């Protein structure tokens, strides 16, 4: 699944999205103590009265019924805390709230790069973690235990991240606060522009942009003093991004988009007021902030950037990268282990691709075979309709075969649709949008029908398995039905699990009757090869001392990617260290757990039951997935 901008925002905001609750545990104990004292006194009073002779002339008064206090179970207490936590976290992080569809804070933009906010986030996390751990996991089971484990793990991870000064690196070409602001303010993102209140909300929120940009500059200056700066190649790419946003007038600005699309039913007086207000805001507040940021990067930041590539070149960089690897893969694998695994997988997959070349009687080495697969006209669809028909036919074949491997009850419908023309240029070959549970709309597998030579026939089967059935559509469709999960789990997710499942789904092609054509099998192998190369290159850059040029050369020598694509991939790994490892590590963990279950259960192994066990609890960290699958194996043995 290609990363959407909103998902990138969620990843980047993870460092500032923290936890909080004022925990009344001691107060509860005091209340219990008071209740016990009152009851003891009442009993003592009754005992004294009972020593007096009873009066036979008066009937005894009936004692009042004592209402027993409601005692909540641990699971109930935690459920309440999780709900309170979610509300508190959205209040702390208004941007995250907006991306989750929560509109209460659409007018707020805190300075989430400031020292004060970092301290507030730390206090938040510490308080919430203490409160949840005070209840403890004893006696919990099922989803309640999983929620506890995930919550505590995430909170401890957030606290561990504080030792690394990521706040000194607030901008790169991949995560860029300037781009976040323009996506929201242009009307193309999560910020709504439907009512007068919506327009006023953005007007108030945008007041925080200059302070946020000023703080980014302050933080980068601190990084320059501490030797914590970005690689020069990344910041060179930021300048043209800013140039594309900076405009001479409000009307030429991307921020003018909401004014171009004012609702027709908005009162004329409001239209005039909002138009004038937005013009002043864009020209006198937003654009000056962008120009100041661009000027700082060009004249101060860029000259101070480093020529080295990976995190290991920074102070405490090895430990920093090891943390990023644990956070991304949700496992205890070391960079060295992942690097070697990547080398082994690259060699294995290249051997498989060579076998395909022999099978189709191709004469030439691997680079020539790669070029043939990319350029031969037999692999090009002749029309948009032919491309769509191919995917729809593929959908029918897969859905007919998938009950052999999956219990399919409750899976939402899936539509195959072309990408809208206005999105086509930037969209991937295929992508997935989950169904809307509120109006019973289906999930959508979007097919990019533009630039047909870039959509070869041989990529279709593995792409549909990954994005559609049984990939993201099954995984996210099932997770969406878990309405009793705490919101931090329903609206969160682990990349290693989500994308690992997508890659694992690709590996099921032959079991589902696909990859019979060797060229289609090549498509699967080529995707798997790229994900394995990521293991080598990401760890090479950040823990093995590789240069950027060395990483690019490795990709060019070992895969079919173009130089342009190789440069973009390598710069992505430099910008978000460790993130690209999650895909392959997740797939390999799911495959290893299946192999373990097959080995230990023998003829009792049921692949449908295994897949249900993997998916039934939603997205979980890989270490927790391993624990729960191993418990399932033990149960099946019993």
Segments (PLM) and residue ranges:
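Bacterial N-terminal signal peptides that target proteins for export
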Residues: 1-12
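N-terminal non-cleavable signal-anchor helices
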Residues: 4-6, 17, 67
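Bacterial N-terminal signal peptides
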Residues: 10-20
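N-terminal maturation segment of proteins
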Residues: 48-638
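Short stretches within intrinsically disordered, low-complexity N-terminal or propeptide regions
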Residues: 14-16, 44, 61-63
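N-terminal propeptides/low-complexity segments immediately following signal peptides
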Residues: 25-59
């Amino acid at each position: 699944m290609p990363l959407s901008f909103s998902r990138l925002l969620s990843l980047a905001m993870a460092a500032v999205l923290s936890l909080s609750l004022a925990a009344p545990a001691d107060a509860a104990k005091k209340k219990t103590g008071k209740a016990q004292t009152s009851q003891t006194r009442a009993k003592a009073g009754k005992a004294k009265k009972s020593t007096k002779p009873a009066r036979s002339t008066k009937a005894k008064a009936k004692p009042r019924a004592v209402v027993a206090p409601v005692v909540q179970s641990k699971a109930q207490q935690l459920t309440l805390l999780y709900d309170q936590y979610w509300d508190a976290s959205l209040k702390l992080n208004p941007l995250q709230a907006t991306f989750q569809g929560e509109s209460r804070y659409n007018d707020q933009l805190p300075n989430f790069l400031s020292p004060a906010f970092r301290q507030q986030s730390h206090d938040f996390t510490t308080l919430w973690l203490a409160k949840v751990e005070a209840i403890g996991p004893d006696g919990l089971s099922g989803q309640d235990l999983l929620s506890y484990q995930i919550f505590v793990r995430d909170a401890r991870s957030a606290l561990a991240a504080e030792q690394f000064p990521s706040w000194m690196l607030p901008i790169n070409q991949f995560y860029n606060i300037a781009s976040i602001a323009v996506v929201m303010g242009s009307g193309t993102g999560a910020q709504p522009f439907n009512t007068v209140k919506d327009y006023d909300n953005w007007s108030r929120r945008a007041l925080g942009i200059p302070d946020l940009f000023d703080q980014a500059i302050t933080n980068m200056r601190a990084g320059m003093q501490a030797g914590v700066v970005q690689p020069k190649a990344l910041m060179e790419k930021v300048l043209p991004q800013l140039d594309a946003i900076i405009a001479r007038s409000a009307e030429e600005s991307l921020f003018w988009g909401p004014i171009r699309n004012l609702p027709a039913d908005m009162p004329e007086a409001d239209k005039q007021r909002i138009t004038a207000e937005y013009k002043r805001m864009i020209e006198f507040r937003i654009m000056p902030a962008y120009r100041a940021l661009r000027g700082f990067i060009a004249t101060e930041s860029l000259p101070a950037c480093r020529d080295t590539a990976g995190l290991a070149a920074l102070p405490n960089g090895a430990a920093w990268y090891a943390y990023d690897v644990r956070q991304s893969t949700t496992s205890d694998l070391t960079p060295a282990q992942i690097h070697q695994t990547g080398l082994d997988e690259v060699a294995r997959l290249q051997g498989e691709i060579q076998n395909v070349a022999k099978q189709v009687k191709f004469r030439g080495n691997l680079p020539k075979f790669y070029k043939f697969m990319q350029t031969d006209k037999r692999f090009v669809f002749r029309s948009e309709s032919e491309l769509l028909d191919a995917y729809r036919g593929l959908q029918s074949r897969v859905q007919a075969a998938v009950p052999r491997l999956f219990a399919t009850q409750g899976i939402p419908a899936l539509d195959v649709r072309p990408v809208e023309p206005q999105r086509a240029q930037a969209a991937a070959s295929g992508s997935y949008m989950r169904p809307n549970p509120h109006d019973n709309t289906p999930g959508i597998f979007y097919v990019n029908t533009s630039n047909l030579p870039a959509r070869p026939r041989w990529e279709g089967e593995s792409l549909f398995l990954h994005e559609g059935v049984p990939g993201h559509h099954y995984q996210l469709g099932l997770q969406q039905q878990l309405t009793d999960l705490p919101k931090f789990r329903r609206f969160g997710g682990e990349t290693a699990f989500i994308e690992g499942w997508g890659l694992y789904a690709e590996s099921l092609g032959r079991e589902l009757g696909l990859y019979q054509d060797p060229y289609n099998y090549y498509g699967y192998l080529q995707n798997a090869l790229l994900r394995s190369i990521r293991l080598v290159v990401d760890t090479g850059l950040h823990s093995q001392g590789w240069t950027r040029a060395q990483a690019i050369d490795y990709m060019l020598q070992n895969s079919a990617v173009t130089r342009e694509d190789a440069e973009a991939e390598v710069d992505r790994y430099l910008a978000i260290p460790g993130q690209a490892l999650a895909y392959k590590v997740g797939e390999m963990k799911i495959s290893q757990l299946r192999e373990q279950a097959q080995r230990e259960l023998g003829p009792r192994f049921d692949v449908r039951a295994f897949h249900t066990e993997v998916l039934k609890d939603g997205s979980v960290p890989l270490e927790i997935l391993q624990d729960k699958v191993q418990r399932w194996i033990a149960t099946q043995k019993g």
